[in-house]
Swiss-Prot record:
Species name: Prochlorococcus marinus (strain MIT 9312)
Catalytic activity: tRNA(Phe) + L-phenylalanine + ATP = L-phenylalanyl-tRNA(Phe) + AMP + diphosphate + H(+)
GO cellular component terms attached to this protein's record: phenylalanine-tRNA ligase complex
Protein's UniProt name: Phenylalanine--tRNA ligase beta subunit
A GO MF label: ATP binding
Cofactor remark: Binds 2 magnesium ions per tetramer.
Length: 814
């Protein structure tokens, strides 16, 4: 945002130097990226009058000019411009002047035998135009208002500075000169003098204007006003042209310049349509009800003010007249209905659009304009009608217009919305002020609080707890909470004036038991050879049940994911294609579902492929794949540090997993996830290149079980001082029996001396039968106070074998 100091001085008293003001603005939050001295290119250039012009004897193209610059002696200047002639007023660079635009210092010099004592300049040489044809001849009326020898900076209003401000998204008020002036007033504690509305106009609530609910939400507004009696051929006065051009906008004509002036002054974009051109477009007289705002349709197009033709689509919002697009809403107007030098009547549009729709439109057409940048940051609709009124007041000054009616889509409620501001909260957050170089401290007084907030336009009502604060419309986008007001108080008083000791000493933070458990989980996986991955949570819309996001950047990232396993399968496939023989990955992330409401669930997901134990010995002709039980053991080992029991329950209800090699994971009797081998159909469809094991566990269930006191608080267990006895038993079981049921029976039977039981081998063979499988278990026996003998465990061991044979219809194998 560029703004000139002279313009600001019309609105606010400025006592600081430009450099000091730049520093104050930057510290206050409006960073000044550059400060430009407008007179730097014209120092030493003055108003002169050409008295005579003689041809140079040594050149056909050069002339010898006598020029009066108001001194006792006329200057003799050699000039090569074709348009030089006597009795014209010109810009004269005197000896010693430096023309920065062309990197030239003026010196007395002899040109083909004739002395030259200066230079008659073009606007290009003064840095005021990109190119010039000959010298600049000054308008006589302008020249006669000044004495000869007057510095050019006075003639062209160049005794000025231009501030280039970097306005952040949270301060949209900085996109207007009035907003910047108010900020300066608050920083310097100086008086404001804003332009008053000389004449107000009738406002008509027009329900006939059709509006797209996405583009014009409840916080938005759309106004359209017919104004007759204007003249598109009229040029802007010098003051207006000077202000907008110093702000970086090229002057076109008075009508267009006035809309741009309101954009800069008020921060409210306006657009003027040529009424006659609109009538020609739709084939009838135009009325306010003919205007509408809607989504563009496929195959529609619009030639815009930049002369380019844009193909439209449903991501673009357009303003239409009788359903024919005449502008890309909030971005750029159409060329066919634009103001020209023949314009005599206009329709003036003033609106506030939904920032999201403007951002989509701007991105879709690849244009970012002064209007769109303001809409994207957010504009208060409470200012729109007053900004339109201000524009009409200016039109009345320069044209004999009719008394227009402002047609509006809705009448904004201008009642103040109050924010509760507590005195105690201010003191608690900010702490005391430092007085007398840290020798004294005191809290901020009520007077200081009221004064600072009043400076930024707030009105305050005293209450027992503090104040109820009403915020002006152009700050309503960023001042919405109590803490925002406290921040403003601190900013305006100066952060450096507060005590360095924080009012609320920060206590050293510590991790919760859930956070510690989550770290244990991650460490457990990485210690067992897993790599943590982070996959993208946004996916394309490939099914209706996905939750759409409101402002997607791409169609490929338009929805929230409802699973993680698909991305993990892709990661495994990429590793396989890259020649990797194993891939163990895990991820803790969110998935999203919708039923009657949106559900966000945190899950631990992962994939296991290959066998890392062989590492580089991949050509040893050994099977490099894990079977189901080995893969399940990897997961068990990774989670062993949590000291919780996870049971397996066979299931065939998960469609992307093998129906005979999948289990639900049960934690504390609750269904907490799954573990299983990828379904063979996914391998046939090439969605999975190898046998992969997938798992998913609900993090809430996992942490809930692992952080209970009986699991979380370590219990001392004396280290065994006597040896254990191990015995292996082998049975052939029907495949219908679960290993967990078998081990539970063993533990229950041998609970007095049995320390642990492990499954150490699985064997399948056609000789055993298709529905049978051999399991080998290792049983560990140990007493607390003595070394066990065979005779001590014989009875219990026999009972275990007997119970297994009875319960599972099997026999002990030799």
């Amino acid at each position: 945002m560029k703004v000139s100091q002279n313009w600001l001085k019309n609105l606010v008293e400025i006592s600081s130097t430009p450099v000091d003001l730049s520093e104050k603005l930057s510290i206050g939050g409006f960073e000044v990226e550059s400060l430009e001295d407008c007179s730097k290119n014209v120092n030493g250039v003055v108003l002169g009058k050409v008295l005579s012009v003689l041809k140079h004897d040594g050149s056909d193209k050069l002339s010898i000019c006598q020029v009066d610059i108001g001194t006792s002696k006329n200057l003799q200047i050699i000039c090569g411009a074709r348009n030089i002639k006597p009795n014209v007023y010109v810009y004269v660079a005197t000896v010693g002047a430096k023309l920065n635009a062309v990197d030239l210092t003026i010196k007395r010099s002899e040109i083909r035998g004739v002395m030259s004592e200066g230079m008659i300049c073009s606007l290009q040489e003064l840095g005021l135009e990109d190119s010039s044809e000959g010298i600049e001849i000054i308008d006589e009326d302008l020249a006669l208002k000044h004495e000869l020898g007057t510095p050019v900076s006075d003639l062209l209003q160049l005794n000025d500075f231009i501030y280039d401000l970097a306005i952040t998204a949270n301060r949209p008020d900085g996109m207007s000169v009035i907003g910047i002036a108010r900020e300066i007033s608050a920083l310097l504690e100086s008086k404001l003098s804003f332009p008053e509305l000389n004449h107000k106009y009738n406002i008509h609530l027009n329900k006939g204007i059709k509006l797209c609910p996405e583009a014009i939400t409840s916080n938005c507004i759309y106004t359209i006003s017919c104004i007759d009696g204007v003249n598109g051929n009229k040029l802007s006065p010098i003051w207006l042209k000077d202000r907008i051009e110093k702000s970086g906008i090229k002057s076109i004509n008075l009508l267009v310049d006035l809309t741009n002036y309101i954009l800069l002054e008020q921060g409210q974009p306006l657009h003027a349509f040529d009424k006659e051109k609109l009538s020609n477009l739709i084939g009838k007289d135009v009325s306010p009800e003919d205007f509408s705002v809607r989504k563009a349709k496929d195959n529609e197009s619009l030639v815009c003010l930049d002369g380019k033709k844009y193909e439209l689509n449903e991501n673009i919002t357009v303003v239409t007249c009788s359903d024919k697009p005449v502008a890309i809403a909030g971005v750029i107007g159409g060329l066919e209905t634009s103001v020209s030098n023949t314009t005599s009547s206009i329709y003036l549009e003033g609106a506030v659009f939904n920032p999201v729709t403007i951002r989509k439109s701007s991105k879709a057409v690849g244009i970012r304009t002064e209007s769109s940048s303001r809409y994207e940051k957010g504009i208060s609709s409470k200012n729109t009608i007053s900004a339109v009124t201000r524009a009409m007041n200016l039109l009345e000054e320069y044209f004999s217009i009719n008394l227009p009616i402002i047609n509006t889509s809705n009448l904004k409620n201008n009642e103040d919305i109050f924010i509760k501001l507590r005195r105690s909260r201010i003191h608690k957050i900010l702490g005391p002020l430092i007085i007398n170089d840290q020798f004294e401290k005191r809290n901020i007084s009520d007077t200081e609080i009221v004064d600072k907030l009043t400076l930024i336009g707030c009105s305050l009502k005293s209450k027992e707890y503090g104040w109820d604060v009403a915020v002006i419309p152009n700050r309503s986008q960023d001042l919405i909470r109590e803490i925002d007001l406290i921040e403003e108080i601190a900013r305006l008083i100066g952060y450096d004036r507060f005590d360095l000791n924080l009012p609320n000493p920060i206590k050293p933070g510590k991790l919760s038991s859930e956070q510690l458990a989550l770290r244990k989980v991650k460490n457990g996986f990485t210690e067992n050879g897993f790599n943590e991955v982070l996959s993208y949570s946004l996916v394309p819309e490939d099914k209706e049940t996905l939750i759409k996001i409101s402002n997607p950047l791409l169609l490929e990232t338009s929805c929230l994911r409802d699973n993680i396993w698909k991305e993990h399968l892709e990661i495994v496939n990429r590793n396989i294609k890259a020649g990797q023989n194993s891939c163990y990955i895990f991820e803790i992330g969110n998935v999203f579902h919708k039923n009657t409401e949106f559900i966000q669930k945190e899950v631990l997901n992962g994939a296991i492929f290959g066998n890392k134990r062989f590492e580089k010995w991949v050509n040893s002709n050994k099977d490099n794949d894990l079977n189901y039980y080995q893969a399940r053991g990897k997961l068990k080992e990774a989670l062993s540090s949590l000291n919780i029991k996870i049971d397996d329950k066979p299931t065939d209800s998960i469609d992307f997993l093998h129906p005979g090699r999948t289990a639900k994971l049960i934690i504390e009797g609750k269904d907490a996830g799954y573990f299983g081998e990828i379904h063979p159909k996914l391998i046939l469809e090439k969605k999975s290149l190898k046998i992969v094991y997938l798992f998913s566990i609900n993090v809430d269930n996992l942490l809930g079980a692992s952080t209970r006191k009986n699991k979380w608080i370590p219990i001392f267990k004396q280290y065994p001082i006597v040896p254990k006895i191990e015995r292996d038993i082998n049975f052939v079981f029907s495949k219908k029996f679960l290993i967990s049921d078998i081990t539970s029976l063993i533990k229950k039977t041998g609970k007095n001396l049995l320390e642990d039981v492990y499954l150490i081998d699985i064997f399948e063979d056609i000789k055993l039968g298709e529905d049978y499988i051999s399991y080998t278990f290792r049983l560990s026996y140990r007493a607390q106070d003595k070394t066990l003998l065979d005779s001590d465990i014989k009875t219990i061991h026999s009972s275990i074998i007997s119970n297994i044979e009875k319960s599972f219809q099997t026999k002990l194998r030799n």
